Amino acid sequence: MKQTIVGVLFLLVLTLSVSSAVAQDEAKRASTKQQLAQLLEKTGPGINVAFRVSQKQTYNFIGTLSKGLANAQSFEIVISVTAKDTIGFRIYPHYAGGYINVDKVKNGPGLMRLLLRLSDRGFLFWGVDETGDVFNGYTFTLESGFPEDAIRVVLRSIVNSDKFIGEMRPFIDGSSAAK
């Protein structure tokens, strides 16, 4: 009987400590979201992007960059505050009316090789999501606090990815690469 009581008390203490840790993690994530919202509100107008909270995922901010581009029609910017103490950028270029999808382009293997080379050359990395859509990305860890200045640098760098869309054109639709 005494062992049962000790076991129940142990499980109760363990449950309370786990739920307390989860609450602290959620509070930290909410605080990071608020800091990011304030930064995006200040920085967005300077890069011609109005950010808003996603209706589907409340820890995501979304915005569209469409000014100052020569190759992409726009860049759809998704910024996520994750439960794992990171902030992730996924920037989806729109070209010819939609996403660039490796399964639907003229030369998928060639585009994939180019994406790998561009990841080596550029500041932001290139990737493909689970549906095959091409994106540009960056991930911050929050171990040392909120990286306000670094986030500003990434936001200002997004427009520079437009030149890479020009390099992708032969693989996307067979047109000439932008000069």
Regions found by a protein language model. Give the residues of each.
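Hydrophobic residues embedded in beta-strands of well-ordered beta-sheets
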Residues: Q57-N60, T86-I87, G132-V134
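Second-shell loop/turn segments in exported
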Residues: Q24-A27, A96-K104, F140-V154
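A short, solvent-exposed beta-edge/loop patch
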Residues: L116-G166
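Short, internal acidic amphipathic alpha-helical interface segments
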Residues: A27, K42, R90-V134
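Bacterial N-terminal signal peptides
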Residues: G7-S17
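Short, highly charged C-terminal tails/helix-capping segments
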Residues: R169-K179
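Charge-rich, low-complexity N-terminal segments
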Residues: Q3, A21-S74
